[in-house]
Amino acid sequence: MSEQKLALNEYLKTDSDYLRGTIKEGLDSSVTGSFSDGDQQLIKFHGFYQQDDRDLRNERKEQKLEPLYSFMLRARVPGGVCTPKQWLGVDEIASTLTSSNSIRLTTRQTFQYHGIPKRNLKTIIQGLDREALDSIAACGDVNRNVMCNPNPVESKLHAQAYEVAKKLSDHLLPHTRAYAEIWLDEEKLLTTEDETVEPVYGKTYLPRKFKMAVAVPPDNDVDVYTNDLGFIAVAENGELVGFNLTAGGGMGSTHGEVETFPRLADDFGFIKTEDVMKFAEAVMTVQRDWGNRTNRKRSRLKYTIVDHGYEKFKAEVEARAGVKFEPKRDVVIGDRGDRYGWVEGVDGKWHLTLFIESGRIKDVPGKSLQTGMREIAKIHKGDFRMTSNQNMIIAGVAPEDKATIEGLARKHGLLGQVLTQTRGHSIACVALPTCPLAMAEAERYFPEFIDHIDALQAKNGISDQAIVVRMTGCPNGCARPFAAEIGLVGKAPGRYNLYLGANFEGTRLNKMYRENIQEAEILAELDALFARYAIERNAGETFGNFTVRTGVVKAVIDAAKDFHG
C-alpha cells in the first residue's frame, strides 16, 4: 500500500529551511507587489498574509494590472498588554506606513495592520522590534497569540495569570532564526538539518494553526472552550494554584462539507501551575505527531481528538507530561462581555474599558479615535489591555488621573456613545474588501446590522437582555460565530447562514436555523423569535437557552455527530 500523499503545505515547510524559503529574494524583487505562491504560505509564520483590494480587483483586471496587493500584519502581544510607549510606536507605524491609516484590534487580543505595501514590510517589523514587539508566530502552523482575561477587578490574580500566558507564548515560540535574519538583518548562522533547531515543532511545525487561551473566572471573554488549548484559572484565597485544562476547541469549518465542523473543547482535569509548560508541550507534541497532515481541512486538534478518541489522547498527554490530571476543580464561568466604563481594581487603581466598534481605531468624521488613543498614550502611566471583544482597556489609572483620561476619551469619541447590551456583546471579523476568504461583508456592514437588532429588541421590549451576536464573512470563524447566540456566517454577497442556540456563557455551540438568506429574511425571522421570547421566556432565561428549550433549534451536544443535520 502506497504512502498517503501529504498536503502541499507539508512539503513547503520541509523544503523551507526552517521558514526561510525564498522570502528574502521575493522581498527584494520590485517586479511584483506579491510573493511567490510557496512564500505566501511561509510568510504567515512571520506574521502576515498577502491580500489585495477586492473592491478594485475587476477594475485593475480590465486595466491589465496585477491586483493591488498589500499585506495584513498581525502582532504577537500575549494577553493583549502593551505599554503607552509601545502604543505610540504602533500608532506611528499605522499613520505613516499603511494605506489603511488605522489599527485593527482583533478577536485574539492583539492588533493588526491592513494595507501594507511590500516595500514597507521590513520597515514595519523593524519598527515593532524597536518597541520590543514582533509578529513571529502570529499566524501559521504554530502556537498563535496567547490570550488572557484582562479581568481588571482581580488585578493580583490577573497578574499571575498573565505571567503564565506570557511564559506560554515565549516557551512555544519557533526557534528558527529566519525572522531575525530576513527582517532584522541579523547574521545567518550555519544551517543545520538537525531537529534541535526546533525542539518542539520539528522541521514541519504543526499540522495546522494552534490557539491557546488563559481564562480567569468568572469571566470568559477569551471564549476559552473555542481554543485548541485552554487553561481556566483556579484560585484559593486569591492566589493562583493551578488550572482546569481544556483541549480540542476550534471554530473553522467549510460550507457543505459535513466532515468539517466547529467544536468546543473537552475538559481534561486540573493541573498545578508548575506543570503548565509540561502539559502545554505535551498537548502540542501529540498534535504534532498525531495530527492529520494529508487534509488541512481536518488538521486541527479537534479532529485529532475526535479521530483518536478522548481517553487515548488523554493517556498520551499524561505520558508525555509525566504527570496525571487531577479531577477538574469547580469554577463558574459566566459573562463573555467586557466591563465598560470605569472599574476599580483591588489595588485601588482604576481601569477604563472603551468600546471600539469592530476593533477599528481610526480617525473618521465626528470621532478621532486614533488621535484620542495617541493623546492618552502620551500621558498614561499604566498600561493598555486589548480585549478579545476587540475593545481597549486603559488600565492602572491613579484616582487623580481619572478626570484627565476620561476628558480625552470623551473629547475624541472614545467614550460617551450610547451602547446597548447587545452591541456591547457583539463582534465581527474584517471580511471584505481585504480578506481573500470572505464571501460576504462583516465589519463594514455589522454596525448597521446591530442597529436593526437593537431596533427589534426595543420593539419587542427586550432591550434589557444582552444577546451575543457575531458575524463573519466566511465559515473559518475568526469572530467565533458558532459560539454566538445569534451567529451570521457569510455564504455569498448579501447572504448569510443564520445560527441560533449557543448559550450566553460560551459552553454550547449554536446550530444552523436558516441557510443562505438575505437581510430582510434574517430580520423577519429574528423579529418573530424576539416576539416569542418577550412573552414565553422564563425568569433569567437567555435568548440562546430559550431557542433550545422551545425547540427552535436542537442543542448541539457532540458537534461531530449533531452540528450538521
Curated annotation (Swiss-Prot):
Annotated residues for binding of siroheme: C478
Cofactor(s) it depends on: siroheme; [4Fe-4S] cluster
Catalytic activity: hydrogen sulfide + 3 NADP(+) + 3 H2O = sulfite + 3 NADPH + 4 H(+)
UniProt-listed Gene3D superfamilies: Sulfite Reductase Hemoprotein, domain 1 (3.30.413.10)
Pathway in which the depicted protein is active: Sulfur metabolism; hydrogen sulfide biosynthesis; hydrogen sulfide from sulfite (NADPH route): step 1/1
SUPFAM superfamilies: Nitrite and sulphite reductase 4Fe-4S domain-like, Nitrite/Sulfite reductase N-terminal domain-like
One function term, GO molecular function aspect: sulfite reductase (NADPH) activity
Matches recorded under InterPro entries: CysI, NiRdtase/SiRdtase_haem-b_fer, Nit/Sulf_reduc_fer-like_dom_sf, NO2/SO3_Rdtase_4Fe4S_dom, NO2/SO3_Rdtase_4Fe4S_prot, NO2/SO3_Rdtase_4Fe4S_sf, NO2/SO3_Rdtase_FeS/sirohaem_BS
Entry EC number(s): 1.8.1.2
Enzyme class, UniProt record, top EC level: oxidoreductase
GO biological process: cysteine biosynthetic process; hydrogen sulfide biosynthetic process; sulfate assimilation
Leader sequence segment: none
Cofactor note text: Binds 1 siroheme per subunit.
Residues involved in [4Fe-4S] cluster binding: C429, C435, C474, C478
PROSITE patterns registered for this protein in UniProt: NIR_SIR
GO CC aspect terms: sulfite reductase complex (NADPH)
Keywords carried by this UniProt record: 4Fe-4S, Amino-acid biosynthesis, Cysteine biosynthesis, Heme, Iron, Iron-sulfur, Metal-binding, NADP, Oxidoreductase
Family (UniProt): Belongs to the nitrite and sulfite reductase 4Fe-4S domain family.
NCBIfam families: CysI (TIGR02041), PRK13504.1 (NF010029)
Function statement: Component of the sulfite reductase complex that catalyzes the 6-electron reduction of sulfite to sulfide. This is one of several activities required for the biosynthesis of L-cysteine from sulfate.
Subunit structure: Alpha(8)-beta(8). The alpha component is a flavoprotein, the beta component is a hemoprotein.
Record protein name field: Sulfite reductase [NADPH] hemoprotein beta-component
